[in-house]
Amino acid sequence: MKKLLLLPLLLVTYFCLSQDAKAIIGKPITIGNLLVAQNDFPKQMKWQDAKKACENLGRGWRLPTKDELHILYQNYVKIGFYSNNFYWSSTEFVFESAWVQYFGNGGQLYINKSETSYVRAIRAF
Protein backbone atom coordinates (compact mmCIF):
# COMPACT_ATOMS: atom_id res chain seq x y z
CA MET A 1 0.00 0.00 0.00
CA LYS A 2 2.83 2.42 0.85
CA LYS A 3 4.39 1.81 -2.57
CA LEU A 4 1.11 2.74 -4.26
CA LEU A 5 0.98 6.00 -2.33
CA LEU A 6 4.61 6.79 -3.11
CA LEU A 7 4.24 6.38 -6.89
CA PRO A 8 2.01 9.47 -7.44
CA LEU A 9 4.39 11.55 -5.32
CA LEU A 10 7.36 10.42 -7.42
CA LEU A 11 5.49 11.21 -10.64
CA VAL A 12 4.59 14.71 -9.43
CA THR A 13 8.20 15.31 -8.34
CA TYR A 14 9.53 14.12 -11.71
CA PHE A 15 7.04 16.31 -13.61
CA CYS A 16 8.00 19.39 -11.58
CA LEU A 17 11.72 18.77 -12.06
CA SER A 18 11.33 18.20 -15.78
CA GLN A 19 9.23 21.37 -16.13
CA ASP A 20 11.89 23.35 -14.24
CA ALA A 21 14.61 21.86 -16.45
CA LYS A 22 12.69 22.84 -19.59
CA ALA A 23 12.30 26.39 -18.29
CA ILE A 24 16.03 26.71 -17.56
CA ILE A 25 17.36 24.98 -20.67
CA GLY A 26 14.80 26.49 -23.06
CA LYS A 27 16.28 26.61 -26.55
CA PRO A 28 20.04 26.15 -25.92
CA ILE A 29 22.51 28.44 -27.70
CA THR A 30 25.53 26.93 -29.45
CA ILE A 31 28.95 28.49 -28.81
CA GLY A 32 31.77 26.42 -30.30
CA ASN A 33 31.35 22.92 -28.89
CA LEU A 34 29.16 24.08 -26.00
CA LEU A 35 25.42 24.24 -25.56
CA VAL A 36 24.42 27.09 -23.25
CA ALA A 37 21.12 27.00 -21.37
CA GLN A 38 18.83 29.78 -22.55
CA ASN A 39 18.04 30.97 -19.03
CA ASP A 40 19.67 31.41 -15.64
CA PHE A 41 18.39 29.58 -12.62
CA PRO A 42 15.79 31.85 -11.01
CA LYS A 43 17.80 32.64 -7.86
CA GLN A 44 21.38 33.02 -6.70
CA MET A 45 22.91 29.95 -5.06
CA LYS A 46 25.88 28.83 -3.05
CA TRP A 47 28.56 27.01 -5.08
CA GLN A 48 27.69 23.45 -4.02
CA ASP A 49 23.98 24.05 -4.69
CA ALA A 50 24.83 25.55 -8.09
CA LYS A 51 26.87 22.48 -9.08
CA LYS A 52 24.11 20.14 -7.98
CA ALA A 53 21.36 22.18 -9.69
CA CYS A 54 23.17 22.01 -13.04
CA GLU A 55 23.82 18.29 -12.71
CA ASN A 56 20.16 17.71 -11.80
CA LEU A 57 19.15 19.04 -15.22
CA GLY A 58 20.46 15.68 -16.51
CA ARG A 59 21.90 14.79 -19.91
CA GLY A 60 25.36 16.17 -19.14
CA TRP A 61 24.38 19.70 -18.06
CA ARG A 62 26.92 21.16 -15.66
CA LEU A 63 28.43 24.28 -14.20
CA PRO A 64 30.89 25.86 -16.68
CA THR A 65 34.60 26.07 -15.96
CA LYS A 66 36.29 29.43 -15.44
CA ASP A 67 37.55 29.40 -19.05
CA GLU A 68 34.15 28.40 -20.45
CA LEU A 69 32.49 31.26 -18.56
CA HIS A 70 34.95 33.66 -20.14
CA ILE A 71 33.97 32.30 -23.57
CA LEU A 72 30.33 33.01 -22.67
CA TYR A 73 31.29 36.56 -21.71
CA GLN A 74 33.11 37.04 -25.04
CA ASN A 75 29.93 35.89 -26.83
CA TYR A 76 27.35 37.62 -24.63
CA VAL A 77 25.71 39.36 -27.61
CA LYS A 78 25.14 36.08 -29.47
CA ILE A 79 23.81 34.47 -26.29
CA GLY A 80 21.64 37.47 -25.38
CA PHE A 81 23.37 37.38 -22.01
CA TYR A 82 23.16 41.00 -20.85
CA SER A 83 23.93 40.98 -17.16
CA ASN A 84 25.79 42.90 -14.49
CA ASN A 85 25.94 39.87 -12.22
CA PHE A 86 28.49 37.37 -10.98
CA TYR A 87 28.20 33.75 -12.21
CA TRP A 88 29.68 30.63 -10.63
CA SER A 89 32.25 28.49 -12.38
CA SER A 90 33.10 24.91 -11.47
CA THR A 91 36.77 25.89 -11.11
CA GLU A 92 37.92 25.84 -7.51
CA PHE A 93 40.64 28.20 -6.29
CA VAL A 94 41.28 26.66 -2.90
CA PHE A 95 39.10 24.38 -0.82
CA GLU A 96 36.77 27.15 0.34
CA SER A 97 36.76 29.32 -2.83
CA ALA A 98 35.79 29.10 -6.48
CA TRP A 99 36.03 31.41 -9.48
CA VAL A 100 33.20 33.65 -10.64
CA GLN A 101 32.80 35.68 -13.82
CA TYR A 102 31.47 39.23 -13.64
CA PHE A 103 29.46 39.91 -16.77
CA GLY A 104 29.48 43.68 -16.23
CA ASN A 105 33.10 44.02 -17.39
CA GLY A 106 34.45 40.48 -17.96
CA GLY A 107 36.47 40.35 -14.77
CA GLN A 108 37.09 37.09 -12.94
CA LEU A 109 37.79 36.64 -9.26
CA TYR A 110 37.43 33.99 -6.62
CA ILE A 111 34.97 34.13 -3.73
CA ASN A 112 34.02 31.91 -0.83
CA LYS A 113 31.77 29.01 -1.85
CA SER A 114 29.30 29.99 0.89
CA GLU A 115 28.54 33.24 -0.97
CA THR A 116 25.74 33.27 -3.54
CA SER A 117 26.02 33.98 -7.26
CA TYR A 118 23.97 33.40 -10.38
CA VAL A 119 24.11 30.19 -12.38
CA ARG A 120 24.01 29.39 -16.11
CA ALA A 121 24.32 25.72 -17.10
CA ILE A 122 26.23 24.38 -20.10
CA ARG A 123 26.97 21.04 -21.70
CA ALA A 124 29.39 19.85 -24.37
CA PHE A 125 28.20 18.16 -27.53
Where do the protein language model's features map onto the residues?
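Short hydrophobic alpha-helical membrane-anchoring segments
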Residues: 11-19
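C-terminal, surface-exposed recognition/capping segments
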Residues: 66-125
